[in-house]
Amino acid sequence: MLRRDKKRESRIARERVFYLIKRAEEWKNIDYELARRYVELARKIAMRYRVRIPRELKATYCKKCLYPYKAGKFRVRVRKSRVIITCLNCGFERRIPIRPKRVNRKV
Amino acid sequence: MRGRLQGVELIARDWIGLMVEVVESPNHSEVGIKGEVVDETQNTLKIMTEKGLKVVAKRGRTFRVWYKGKIMRIKGDLINFRPEDRIKRGLMMLKRAKGVWI
């Protein structure tokens, strides 16, 4: 029986996801709509082959409308011990909590 | 013909960003379209040429591709999938073909 080579698939998928998000980052000032399409494709591939997108790459685009954040189109504020990133295209707020460093109580 | 097939990666890889030229096409005015692929759908490639954006169907065409310093000819029928499907279905399609090692 023919089997899928899942290791190979996920390796190729990972390459493609990283490549597309990087490309979206480069193209966002040239063609914003196309940059969004790259993010969309990257996410589709990542979901199908269960590739995890690292946190620092996830923070480069809006989770809701998938437009990459670019200068003038997003706002970053620190409120109530959270970093709040607002997308000015769709108004979606992403809240990233800032955890204080763990203190070892026993000492 | 047995042996490892060249350019298997290309079927599963991203075509966005590659230089491409249309070599054969049932539509004569499409032959010679050359440029960078900027977007891809299930049935078409969107190619950015010097004269603007061109949309070329994949089925029935042959493409010349510049990839890692090599020039390859690829039939459009082989990549006639959705871009995210191409990894799985493209590789399986090659596996099913007789006498092909990947």
Curated annotation (Swiss-Prot), chain A:
It is an enzyme of class 3 (hydrolase). Its EC number is 3.1.26.5. GO terms for cellular component: cytoplasm; ribonuclease P complex. Its main location: cytoplasm. Zn(2+) binds at C62, C65, C87, C90. It catalyses: Endonucleolytic cleavage of RNA, removing 5'-extranucleotides from tRNA precursor. It is found in: Cytoplasm. Consists of a catalytic RNA component and at least 4-5 protein subunits. Part of ribonuclease P, a protein complex that generates mature tRNA molecules by cleaving their 5'-ends. This is Ribonuclease P protein component 4. It comes from Archaeoglobus fulgidus (strain ATCC 49558 / DSM 4304 / JCM 9628 / NBRC 100126 / VC-16). The gene is rnp4.
UniProtKB/Swiss-Prot annotation, chain B:
The keyword Nuclease applies. It catalyses: Endonucleolytic cleavage of RNA, removing 5'-extranucleotides from tRNA precursor. Keywords: Cytoplasm, Endonuclease, Hydrolase, Nuclease, tRNA processing. GO terms for molecular function: ribonuclease P activity; ribonuclease P RNA binding. Its EC number is 3.1.26.5. The keyword Metal-binding does not apply. It is found in: Cytoplasm. GO terms for biological process: rRNA processing; tRNA 5'-leader removal. GO terms for cellular component: cytoplasm; ribonuclease MRP complex; ribonuclease P complex. InterPro entries: RNase_P/MRP_Rpp29-subunit, RNase_P/MRP_Rpp29_sf, RNP1, Rof/RNase_P-like, Rpp29/RNP1. Consists of a catalytic RNA component and at least 4-5 protein subunits. Belongs to the eukaryotic/archaeal RNase P protein component 1 family. Part of ribonuclease P, a protein complex that generates mature tRNA molecules by cleaving their 5'-ends. HAMAP family: RNase_P_1. This is Ribonuclease P protein component 1. It comes from Archaeoglobus fulgidus (strain ATCC 49558 / DSM 4304 / JCM 9628 / NBRC 100126 / VC-16). The lineage of its organism: Archaea, Methanobacteriati, Methanobacteriota, Archaeoglobi, Archaeoglobales.
